[in-house]
């Protein structure tokens, strides 16, 4: 999608857009959605949209996926806000002392309106019979890591000899805790560091001899993996497919458009707040010939990851409200 501007100046008869849910941002259309709309308008092409998860977090995500279509189900609406007046239960949400409109409660009639335009297949109907097994494995982090997290929760600041960890807002506290539960931290200065290699070492020992794909969240987690695995780890899909033992991919960038069919298992160093990331990334090994997928989640004992997991498996993003509720029960 980011390379649409490089397409040759051809009057296409048909455009097929894969992973169409990537255009579903709202209330404002994303650059991806606007560029796609311009392409359709220019070429007057027919369009086929493909997605395994068209509305992973909200039915409201449907509008900008189809707003490029001049005869689509919602073409009568000038913009998302007009669409929302008829199709969304708009609520007010308090954030930072301000009230903002929340458009996530799209009504089920959105899907009903889409039905005449939609062909739906389950994986089984499409010939995929894979059984996915997920296992959560907990590790005990270093005592100093838990000490830092407890102090940060209590004081909202941890001062070292050279660096400071500051969590002066609820959002920053959530992100810092998320980082620390996998043994990394980004300091107030902007510098980052691995302070605990426990997860990386556990993965190396537990999956020794297996070809695995590892999903990580933060950049320093990749640094930890490189330090522990050395030359056995690659970030190149071509190298992995050619016989590589371990591939590491960032969750968001690796959740779509790639196949890890050569992997024996998927291992998650960390977990993303996004339900889309959960449902998309864990399906990267699936092929028609494969009968079983093994997926492993590596969580810190007493950490935030299990609470995130509970949310995203129910197709809900993990939010600040979840974190405020869960904070007192951590470690």
Cite the ranges covered by each PLM segment.
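Conserved P-loop NTPase motor "coupling/switch" region that bridges the ATPase
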Residues: 14, 31-125, 290
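Conserved Helicase C-terminal RecA-like lobe
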Residues: 11, 128-261, 265, 323-331
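A short beta-strand element within the Helicase C-terminal
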Residues: 64, 259-271, 294-297
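Catalytic P-loop NTPase motifs of RecA-like helicase/translocase cores
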Residues: 4, 22-27, 56-57, 275, ...
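Conserved helix/coil segment N-terminal to the catalytic DExD/H
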Residues: 1-14
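A conserved SF2-helicase RecA2
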Residues: 273-282, 286-331
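Phosphate- and divalent-cation-binding pockets in alpha/beta enzyme and binding domains
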Residues: 3-6, 58-64, 148, 221-225, ...
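Walker B catalytic acidic pair
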Residues: 18-19
């Amino acid at each position: 999608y980011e390379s649409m501007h490089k397409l040759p100046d051809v009057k296409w008869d048909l455009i097929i857009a894969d992973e169409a849910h990537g255009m579903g941002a709202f209330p404002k259309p994303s650059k991806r959605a606007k560029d796609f709309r311009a392409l359709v308008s220019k070429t007057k092409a027919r369009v086929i949209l493909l997605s395994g998860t068209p509305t992973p977090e909200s039915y409201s995500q449907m509008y900008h996926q189809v707003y490029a279509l001049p005869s689509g189900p919602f073409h009568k609406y000038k913009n998302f806000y007009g669409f929302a007046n008829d199709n969304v239960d708009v609520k007010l949400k308090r954030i930072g002392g301000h009230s903002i409109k929340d458009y996530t409660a799209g009504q089920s009639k959105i899907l009903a309106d889409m039905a005449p335009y939609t062909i739906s297949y389950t994986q089984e109907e499409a010939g995929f019979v894979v059984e996915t097994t997920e296992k959560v494995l907990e590790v005990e982090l270093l005592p100093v890591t838990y000490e830092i997290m407890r102090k940060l929760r209590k004081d909202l600041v941890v001062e070292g000899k050279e660096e400071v960890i500051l969590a002066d807002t609820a959002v920053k506290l959530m992100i810092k805790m998320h980082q620390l539960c996998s043994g990394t931290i980004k300091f107030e200065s902007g510098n980052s560091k691995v302070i605990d290699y426990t997860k990386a070492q556990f993965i190396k020992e537990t999956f020794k001899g297996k070809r695995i794909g590892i999903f990580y969240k933060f950049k320093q987690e990749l640094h930890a993996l490189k330090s522990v695995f050395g030359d056995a780890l690659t970030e190149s899909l071509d190298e992995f497919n050619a016989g590589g033992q371990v591939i590491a991919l960032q969750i968001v960038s690796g959740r779509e458009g790639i196949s890890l069919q050569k992997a024996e298992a998927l291992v998650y160093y960390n977990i993303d707040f996004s339900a889309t990331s959960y449902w998309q990334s864990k399906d990267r090994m699936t092929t028609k010939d494969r009968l079983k997928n093994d997926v492993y989640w590596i969580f810190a004992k007493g950490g935030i990851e299990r609470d995130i997991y509970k949310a995203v498996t129910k197709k809900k993003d993990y939010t600040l409200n979840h974190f405020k509720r869960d904070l007192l029960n951590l470690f």
